[in-house]
Amino acid sequence: MRLSPIPLALAAALCLTPAWAQPGPASPTPSPRATPAGQVLTLEQALATAYKRSPLLAAARNEAASSEGQLTQAGVIPNPSIEVGIDDNRRTTRTTTTTLSMPVELGGKRAARVKAAGLARDIAQRDLSSARADLRAAVIAAFFDVAVAQETVRVSQGAVEIAQNALRLAERRVAAGKAPPLESSKARVELANSRIEARAADSALQAARRKLGQLWGAPQPDFAQVGADLDTLPRREAIDDLRAALATSPRMEAGRLSVEMGRAQLEVEKSKRYPDITLSAGVARDNEQGRNKAQFGVAIPLPLFDRNQGNVYSATMQSYKAQDMYRELESRLTADLLQSVSQFDLAANSAREYRATVLPGAAEAYDSARKGFEAGKVSFLEVLDAQRTLSQGNIGYLNVLASAYQASADIDRILGR
C-alpha cells in the first residue's frame, strides 16, 4: 500500500523540521498496525468476492434467469382437449362420443406475447447489469472508506503522540518555573481530546470494515485491512464523454426498452379483442345402429359485450406512463451525473490544495510554534492552536479524499460501469 501525505505531515511535525521544507528524503512514516500478509484485501479481491457472494447480485441473476422461462412460456400454443360422452345407460342403445378440441389463437396473440416477453427479458438483463454496477460502486466506495478510515486512525494516533510531546514540554516548563500550572492542565485536556478522537476513529474504522464485508454477505469482516493507493486520485472523463456514456448506460437502455415494452403490452391487449375459435373433431359410436358417425365443429365466441376495451385503455395509459418515466429517468440521471461530477471536482481540487498548501503549511506552523515555545518566545496557547490546525488539516484532507472516491464511485454507478 502506498502511503499518503498525511503520515508525512505528522512525521514532519514530530521531527521538528517539515519534510516539505528540506530537499532531503522524506521522513519515515509511522508503521501500520501489524496484520498477517494474507489478510490484506485489495480492491480487485473485494470486487471478485462481492461478485461471487453478494446476495443482491445473486437475486438479480435469478430474476434475469426467470425471464427466460417467461419467454419460453409465451411462445407455447394452447393444449388440445379430449371429451368423452355417453348417451343412454343401456348398452344396446348407448351412443358414445369422443371429441378432440383444439383452440386456435387469432389476432396475433402468440407473436405479441413473445415480443413482450422478449422485451421483459432484455429489461431483466439490463437490470442485472445495473445491479452489478451498483454493487461495484458500493464496493469501491466502501473499500476506500476503509482505506481512509485506516489512515484516519494513523493520523489520530499521530495526534495523540503530538499531544503527549506537548504535555511533556509543558510539564518541563512548569517544573522549571517558566510557566504557570495552567499550561500543563491545558496540555492534559488536549491529550484527552486527542485520545477521544483516536477512539472515535478506531470505531469508525470498525464500522467501515463491517459495511464493506456486508456487501458480500459477511456478518463480520473476513479481512484485517485493505491495501489502497491513496496518493493517486481517481480521474474523470470530459463532460461530453460522460454524457455519451450515460446515453448507452444499462439504466437508460432499460428505460428505452420499458417504453417499447409498454407498446408491446398494448399490442397484446389489442390482440385479445379478436376471439379465439375452437376446432373440434370426433366420432360417435351408435350401438343401436352399429355404426360410427364422424363429427366436426367450430366454436366462435361472439364479442358482443367483452371486447377487452378496458384492458386496451389501461395498456394505452401504461404506455404513456412508460414514456413519461423515461423522460424523468433521463432528466434525473443527467442531473445526478452532473451533481456527482461537481462533487468530484470540488473534492479533487480541495485534495490538491491540501497537499500543496494546507498540510505543508500546518506542519511548518506547528514546528515553528513548538520551537518558539521551547525558546520561550511564544505562548503555549499558540502551540495548541497550531496543533489543532495541523490535526484539522489532516482530518480535512482525509474527508475530501473520501468525498472524491465516493463521487467517482457515484459516477461509475450512474453510468452502469
Language-model features: where?
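Acidic, low-complexity, intrinsically disordered peripheral segments
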Residues: R2-P7, Q22, S27-T29, T35, ...
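Periplasmic alpha-helical coiled-coil/stalk elements that build and connect Gram-negative outer-membrane
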Residues: Q22, A131-A244, T248, S340, ...
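Amphipathic alpha-helical coiled-coil segments
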Residues: A59-L71, A131, L135-S156, N165-R168, ...
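Bacterial Sec-pathway N-terminal export signals of envelope proteins
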Residues: A21-D87, R94, S101-V104, A112, ...
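Small/polar-residue-enriched beta-strand and adjacent coil segments characteristic
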Residues: V40-L43, P80-A131, E253-E330, S340-Q343, ...
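Bacterial N-terminal signal peptides
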Residues: P7-P18
